[in-house]
Design a protein with these regions (language model features):
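Residue-level preference for beta-strand/loop junctions
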Residues: 1, 74-76, 104
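Soluble, non-transmembrane catalytic domains of enzymes that act on hydrophobic metabolites at membranes
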Residues: 2, 40-43, 98, 105-109, ...
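Hydrophobic pocket/interface hotspot
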Residues: 16-20, 123, 157
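A conserved amphipathic terminal alpha-helix motif
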Residues: 81-86, 135-163
Length: 163
């Protein structure tokens, strides 16, 4: 499953990344906006001028279809590792669920560009699930969740950046 979403921003890439990688904001985003049951920045090394790596761990209880819930349980705890490259204004990430990690591969990127005086975000996600008989169902669920979470995240970030 591949997903690509594009958003326009009325801020500089520097302002976007400063908020995105603010550890306190990341936790608030998950707890106040995305409905996470827990959220913690486990580590963040480097900075926005030279590049950084952040490990974020969060738990969620999304409304899952029966077969997905049976595989992953009521709560999904995810570890997200993001690597930011300031020269390309891009962060790449991997998301590893606590359950079925060996059968689930999720990676993506957020890239920012400047176009006509505004910032354009391109969010991309690639999810591959190798669970016999359930892979496509889980991939569709991941796509649905990604779209919903991105929409909520954008609104929350806009409130902070543009509000």
């Amino acid at each position: 499953m591949k997903l690509s979403l594009v958003y326009g921003w009325d801020c500089t890439p520097e302002a976007f990344w400063a908020l995105y990688f603010d550890p306190e904001f990341a936790v608030r985003l998950h707890l106040e906006c995305l409905g996470s049951t827990s959220a913690e920045v486990e580590s963040q090394e480097g900075d926005l001028t030279t590049g950084l790596v952040r490990t974020l761990r969060y738990g969620q209880r999304p409304p899952m279809p029966g077969p997905v819930r049976k595989i992953f349980g009521e709560e999904v705890v995810t570890t997200e590792v993001s690597t930011y490259d300031p020269t390309s204004s891009t962060t790449t990430f991997t998301m590893t669920p606590g359950t079925m990690a060996d059968k689930t591969h999720i990676e993506g990127a957020i890239a920012l560009t400047r176009e006509s005086g505004s910032t354009v975000e391109t969010f991309s996600l690639d999810a591959r699930v190798k669970i016999f008989g359930a892979g496509p169902i889980v991939e569709r669920f991941i796509e649905h969740q990604a779209r919903e979470m991105q929409g909520k995240s954008v609104l929350f970030m806009r409130g902070e950046l543009e509000g």
